[in-house]
């Protein structure tokens, strides 16, 4: 049975995303849940996102499901940093989850809410709601959205910012549902494993790499040019410190397309020649187009092919 690592305890948004991935047949070796509802995988619960990726690296898990980007807070930096260093890992699938929080309390609680347990990322997305509805409550940090529910269930907080799944698992009452300060809050989760053949190209794919560049004038522009001259749509460019020397950075790039698309393949080869290091994070389906797909065989390519095979290059 495949082992899948994710941030615990049970009931986190990551688990919700993973269950949706399983339901859509996106996890290798795991079929959608049968009628008895039993999951076709063994959960490996960890106390952090880097911990979930470490479980894949050290063989305790076959895959990890981790958040990588949030529409409110931006990139999930612990995920990026963990993917960029250590033994290589590869992304095989992604799922975008609409995020809204459930405010939970213990059954029968009727007194004032003096303390609210909240995961810091969740707190940033419900501050206005808490200020309007629970202005006198003190926030108690929790290690995850599901952990906030456990804090409430075990009597260490009067209320918690959590998930509907965690409320059900812990037997808690719902004080408020679908709570979020910004409408359309969404988080993108990815399924990560050890390096292997990528999923087949679908026409709606994403490719991600991490670049390390020499500290030279125009180095970053030159790398970007490899995409622009091939009409490849870059959807994310982000820098992170290397943590090895002050002022040195690595660059995360996402583009539309698959490594088996000729323009993307040519761009990756050019980056390999040009950059100090290129870490390939994978090519995987996005389900729907996230931008302009790379161009197909163009007139210039047909012209060159004609010269090569002797059929003429006119």
Language-model segment annotations:
Residues 1-314:
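Domain-level signature for soluble enzymes in the chorismate/prephenate branch of the shikimate pathway
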């Amino acid at each position: 049975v495949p082992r899948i690592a994710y941030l615990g305890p049970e009931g986190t948004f990551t688990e919700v995303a993973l269950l949706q991935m399983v339901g859509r047949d996106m996890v290798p070796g795991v079929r959608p849940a049968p009628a008895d509802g039993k999951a076709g995988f063994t959960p490996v619960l960890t106390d952090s996102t880097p911990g979930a990726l470490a479980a894949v690296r050290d063989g305790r898990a076959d895959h990890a499901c981790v958040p990588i980007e949030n529409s409110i807070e931006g990139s999930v930096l612990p995920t990026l940093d963990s993917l960029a260093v250590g033994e290589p890992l590869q992304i095989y699938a992604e799922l975008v989850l609409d995020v809204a929080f459930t405010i939970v309390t213990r059954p029968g609680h009727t007194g004032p809410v003096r303390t609210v347990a909240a995961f810091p990322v969740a707190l940033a997305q419900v501050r206005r709601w808490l200020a309007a509805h629970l202005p006198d409550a003190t926030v108690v940090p929790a290690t995850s959205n599901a952990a906030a529910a456990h804090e409430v269930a075990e009597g260490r907080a009067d209320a918690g910012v959590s998930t509907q799944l965690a409320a059900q698992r812990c037997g808690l009452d719902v004080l408020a549902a679908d709570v979020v300060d910004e409408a359309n809050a969404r988080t993108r989760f990815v399924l990560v494993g050890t390096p292997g053949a990528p999923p087949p190209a679908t026409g709606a794919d994403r490719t991600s790499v991490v670049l390390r560049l020499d500290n030279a004038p125009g180095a970053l522009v030159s790398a970007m040019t490899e995409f622009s001259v091939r009409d490849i749509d870059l959807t994310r460019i982000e820098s992170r410190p290397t943590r090895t020397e002050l002022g040195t950075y690595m660059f995360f790039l996402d583009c539309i397309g698959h490594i088996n698309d000729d323009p993307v393949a040519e761009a990756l080869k050019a980056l390999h020649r040009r950059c100090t290091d290129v870490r390939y994070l994978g090519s995987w389906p996005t389900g729907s187009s996230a931008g302009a797909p790379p161009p197909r065989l163009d007139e210039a390519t047909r012209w060159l092919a004609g010269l090569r095979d002797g059929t003429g290059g006119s």
